[in-house]
């Protein structure tokens, strides 16, 4: 991840008017939170304000956007209903040029989840009520979690058909994955975006997992350093 500059603005409410201090510090790609904390301490020192007196901290970042553009997000694994692992590949068949084979389809050539990491799980819910037609095979979930851990994949999504009607299988699968791979970031599609239509739900969850690990560490600021 390339280095850039962080803009830090401090507004200090005075008795008659608000005072504003501004500073810039280099970003710290190895640990984005480090640069933010450094910038806050620097602008507080510049304004003569005790960091512990900060009441509200707003934070805006393009870290997630840059990860998507530069294609350097997390390696993602996926557990999905057997027979439906190619939903992320097919999408909605909307293409830039419907009848041309000579163009790039980004979600196929640069998928958020590589096909080999999309693992099918035997389970099935039925609309319109979400009743369980085929119980989830928990052994398959454990085997899939073990395989993804062996591959060094620490960001995993669980995306089952019709989970917006009943997320029982997804939540249980998430628990099983964590029991095998406790350090993994695990996202259930029904928790990320609980909407009808599989592609929209699956792809949104995949995007969340793609940017999630780095974004999480970036947003988990060591506030103890500000006291």
Question: What label would you give each PLM region?
Answer:
Residues 74-130, 189-193:
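Active-site phosphate-binding/coordination module
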Residues 159-169:
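Glycine-rich phosphate-binding loops at beta-strand->alpha-helix junctions
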Residues 203-216:
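A polyampholytic, Gly/Pro-enriched intrinsically disordered region
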Residues 217-223:
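Conserved small/polar residues in nucleotide/adenosyl-binding loops
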